[in-house]
Every structure is written in structure tokens, then in C-alpha cells.
């Protein structure tokens, strides 16, 4: 790719139907983990007009009222009126959970010599990424796409824009010059709204109250704004589209700036490497960049079902590393335990912290529960790489 280019990422609000499904799945996971931290959970959700279906595989000693958890999640998001797309009070909730297959369980539970040799819950490949485009070490387009829909939710909830409804989407196109974010080329923001609102009033409020307070002002000189470009967005949420768990995997990660192994996160307990290893790969990549070993870092790990140790740990820095990629990969293997149980232990993942991850991105958020965002390996990595002193600030 040339060093001068346009790149686009999108995000969706907590009220988007797929995100409603993700949040219900993770709320159920949290409710189970609060009682049984060793539960096996694969909770899938479908939500449509007036209907929520809970299905998947759960093996647990916990006693959870799944229907109540689903309704409370829908209520928290803001769907308390059928006119908005679904009403938590009146929607039907169907429960169809089974137990985890014993064929899968035996591979995960089997340990050859110690606790840390629990096998992976499935085969697969996972990616982690970090770069110095933002202080949070996330790609600029996805970071700000998240902040836009987060702002939409804030203004809806605090009543400053009372005509906003829960469903919304954002898209940010950034112009890169010399490989760095230079300016915002285009912003698309579509938001569900009350039927009496005019397009002109919506456009003005969205630009002035949502977009401009979020994006860096010096990057907006020639920005094109597309607000509700269809002209009307009254029907939304699960009424506008059927929502399913796991359909926003690029929104959940890096907005297309890094590859994705294909496995979704929400509703899965941390024995599933789709989730836990992707979190660990982000932790590795962020520490590599924060340590000043590279300006960007992509980490790939892969697993075989029932086998504890990763098949591969591969690091790419796209020529930005101060030491060879192979040397960074060796440091990663020495200082990060990427066996499934090692990850759970390293990141303290047996906690009910997952519902918060299910909207506005799993990465690049300085939430106290997000242990995978810590940069506590920086000095260790620098010392092991033979670099003296504290790293320079990664974000330029």
C-alpha cells in the first residue's frame, strides 16, 4: 500500500440489533461467571421484532434467570417502547440452551501434567494489533468511529437530544499522508430518531453536538458530512433488522486495519481461545508498541483443539520495529504465557466483566476491567531487547 491513502472503519451503537444480541449474550455470560467462574458458556442470541431467542451450549452449576437477564439488558440499552424497535416488558423470550459436547469437554479438560496445560477449546487463528496513531494505541478510524456512537448514546441518555433513539451507526474515512492520519475525509452518521424530527434539524444537531466535539478540530477543514443519508431513520433496532450474536467482529476489533481470524467474542467463556487468545494477542501487541519496540505490531497465534501450546506465535511490524520481528516473537514466547489457562491466569479472565466489552469495542478503552489493555510488560520487554531506559511516548 502507498503511504498516501484513504482508510475507512465503522462502528455501531449499543442499540444496533447485532449489538443488542452481543450484549445479551455477554450479560448472560457475566451472570453465570458471577456464580460459577469455571462454567462453559457459548451463549448465542437472536433478536427480532418482539422476539428474543437464547440458544447455545452452557454447562454450569449457576442458577440464572436467563429471561430476566435478557429483559434487563434490553431495558438498559433503552428499548422500553415498541415504537423504538422492541420493548423489554412485552417481548417474547425463548430459551433453548444445551450442555457443552462431552467430545469438546474432554479435549479442553485433559491436562498432561499440570493445570496450565488445559487444551484449547477449539482450533483457530487469532490476531492482535496495536499502533501509535492514538494514545490508546489503536487505529485512528475505528477509535473515533466508536467515540461517535458512544457520544450519540450519551446525548440520548442525558436528555440533551431527547429525540435520539438507541440504534445508530458511524463510519469514518481518514486520509493518510506519509503513512500517518492527516485529515478526516468523510464522516457518515446514521441515527434512529423520533418521527417528528426534520432532516435539517437532525443534520445540524448531529454535526454540531456529536461529530465536532469528538473528532480533532484540526483534521476537519475539508471533511464531508453524511448524516442519515437515506433521509429518514425511524424504524430501527430489532424491528428494522434481525440481530445476531457475533456479526460485528470487525467493529469489535480493529475496524479492518488488521486481519481477523473469524471467531466472534460475545457469549463465550475464556476457555474459548476465539476470545481469550484475541485479548492476549492485543495485550502482547500493545506492550510491544508501548515499549517502543515498534510503531505498529500485529500478532498472530493459532491453536489446535485439546492442545495447550500455540501452534505458532508470529509477529509483524511492517518495517517499524527497532529489532527484527523474529526477535520480538522470541521475546513474546519468553515473557507471555499464551496457553489457554496461562492467558486466563495472566489476564484474570474468570471475572464477570464481559457485558461492558460488547459495545464500543473490545480494545482501546481504558476501562479498569480490561486487563488486556495494561502496559505492564513494557520495562521487561525493553530490558530483554537490550534497550536502555524508559520508552519514548509511543503516540506521536
Swiss-Prot record:
| Any Pfam family hit | S-AdoMet_synt_N
Annotated GO molecular function terms are: ATP binding; magnesium ion binding; methionine adenosyltransferase activity
Highest taxon above the source species? Bacteria
> What coarse category fits the chief subcellular location reported for this protein?
cytoplasm
Q: Which GO terms describe its cellular component?
A: cytoplasm
Q: Where does L-methionine bind?
A: 57, 100, 241, 272
Q: Where on this chain does ATP bind?
A: 16, 167-169, 232-233, 241, 247-248, 264, 268
Entry-linked PANTHER family: S-ADENOSYLMETHIONINE SYNTHETASE (PTHR11964)
Q: Please report which protein family the annotation says this sequence is part of.
A: Belongs to the AdoMet synthase family.
- Subunit structure comment from the entry: Homotetramer; dimer of dimers.
Q: Please give the name of this protein.
A: S-adenosylmethionine synthase
Provide the species name. Answer: Ralstonia pickettii (strain 12J)
Amino acid at each position: 500500500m502507498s503511504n498516501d491513502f484513504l482508510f475507512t472503519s465503522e462502528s455501531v451503537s449499543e442499540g444496533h440489533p447485532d449489538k443488542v444480541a452481543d450484549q445479551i449474550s455477554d450479560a448472560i455470560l457475566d451472570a453465570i461467571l458471577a456464580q460459577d467462574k469455571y462454567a462453559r458458556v457459548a451463549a448465542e442470541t437472536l433478536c427480532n421484532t418482539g422476539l428474543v431467542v437464547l440458544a447455545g451450549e452452557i454447562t454450569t452449576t449457576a442458577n440464572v434467570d436467563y429471561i430476566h437477564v435478557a429483559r434487563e439488558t434490553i431495558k438498559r440499552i433503552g428499548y422500553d417502547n415498541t415504537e423504538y424497535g422492541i420493548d423489554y416488558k412485552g417481548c417474547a423470550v425463548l430459551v433453548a440452551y444445551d450442555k457443552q459436547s462431552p467430545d469438546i469437554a474432554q479435549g479442553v479438560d485433559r491436562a498432561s501434567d499440570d493445570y496450565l496445560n488445559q487444551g484449547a477449546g477449539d482450533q483457530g487463528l487469532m490476531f492482535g494489533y496495536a499502533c501509535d496513531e492514538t494514545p490508546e494505541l489503536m487505529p485512528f478510524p475505528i477509535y473515533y468511529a466508536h467515540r461517535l456512537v458512544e457520544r450519540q448514546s450519551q446525548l440520548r441518555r442525558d436528555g440533551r437530544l431527547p429525540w435520539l433513539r438507541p440504534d445508530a451507526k458511524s463510519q469514518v474515512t481518514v486520509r493518510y499522508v506519509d503513512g500517518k492520519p492527516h485529515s478526516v475525509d468523510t464522516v457518515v452518521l446514521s441515527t434512529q430518531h423520533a418521527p417528528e424530527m426534520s432532516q435539517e434539524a437532525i443534520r445540524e444537531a448531529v454535526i454540531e453536538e456529536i461529530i465536532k466535539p469528538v473528532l480533532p478540530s484540526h483534521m476537519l477543514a475539508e471533511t464531508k458530512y453524511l448524516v442519515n443519508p437515506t433521509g429518514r431513520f425511524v424504524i430501527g433496532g430489532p424491528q428494522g433488522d434481525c440481530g445476531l450474536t457475533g456479526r460485528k467482529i470487525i467493529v469489535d476489533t480493529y475496524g479492518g486495519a488488521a486481519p481477523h481470524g473469524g471467531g466472534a467474542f460475545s457469549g463465550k467463556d475464556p476457555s474459548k481461545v476465539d476470545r481469550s487468545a484475541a485479548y492476549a494477542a492485543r495485550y502482547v501487541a500493545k506492550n510491544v508498541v508501548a515499549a517502543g519496540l515498534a510503531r505498529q505490531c500485529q500478532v498472530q497465534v493459532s491453536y489446535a483443539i485439546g492442545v495447550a501450546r500455540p501452534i505458532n506465535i508470529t509477529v509483524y511490524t511492517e518495517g517499524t520495529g527497532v529489532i527484527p520481528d523474529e526477535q520480538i516473537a522470541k521475546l513474546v514466547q519468553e515473557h507471555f504465557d499464551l496457553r489457554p489457562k496461562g492467558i486466563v491466569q495472566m489476564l484474570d479472565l474468570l471475572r464477570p466483566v464481559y457485558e461492558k466489552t460488547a459495545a464500543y469495542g473490545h480494545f482501546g478503552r481504558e476501562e479498569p476491567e480490561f486487563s488486556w489493555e495494561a502496559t505492564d510488560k513494557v520495562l521487561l520487554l525493553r530490558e530483554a531487547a537490550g534497550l536502555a531506559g524508559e520508552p519514548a511516548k509511543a503516540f506521536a
